[in-house]
Structure formats: C-alpha cells, structure tokens
Swiss-Prot record:
Top-level EC class as recorded in UniProt: hydrolase
Keyword Cytoplasm: yes
The protein, known as: Exodeoxyribonuclease 7 small subunit
EC number of this enzyme: 3.1.11.6
Organism lineage string: Bacteria, Pseudomonadati, Campylobacterota, Epsilonproteobacteria, Campylobacterales
Protein family (similarity comment): Belongs to the XseB family.
Amino acid sequence: MQDELFETEKAPQKNTKNAKNAPKKSFEEHAHSLEQAIDRLNDSNLSLKDGMDLYKTAMQELFLAQKLLENAYLEYEKLQTPDKKA
C-alpha cells in the first residue's frame, strides 16, 4: 500500500505562462486547489472544454502534491536512519 501512495505517473504538462514567476505552493495549498477543482467539476453546468481544462489543472495539482508528500516522506526516512558514515 505504501508503494501506491508514492507511485507517480508522468507529470502533466505545466502551464508555462506564469510558471517561472509563480511562488511554490505548499502541500496544503495544492490539496486545497485540488478540492476546489473537484467541487467545480461536480457542477452540472460546466462545459466540456472548461471541464477538461479544470481536469488538467486538477491533475497538475495532484501530481505536485504527491511530489511534495514523497519528498517529505524521503526526508522523514532519512532522519530516521542512523548516519552510517560515523
């Protein structure tokens, strides 16, 4: 099950318009954006195009949140492992 949590797929393509200038989001911010996208995707009045755009955005948020979670787990594991160089 643990492997499933950290299994990542190929990263969705990023929107490069503002990616260089945008500050990095926290895990919580990505999770919140994902929740908002899911809420909007449940809107029955959402057009197909808007739904697809929103889905792509949600997948990007999910991927970035997973990467942050994976990095945090790896850092945790590193802290739990005694330094073998000493």
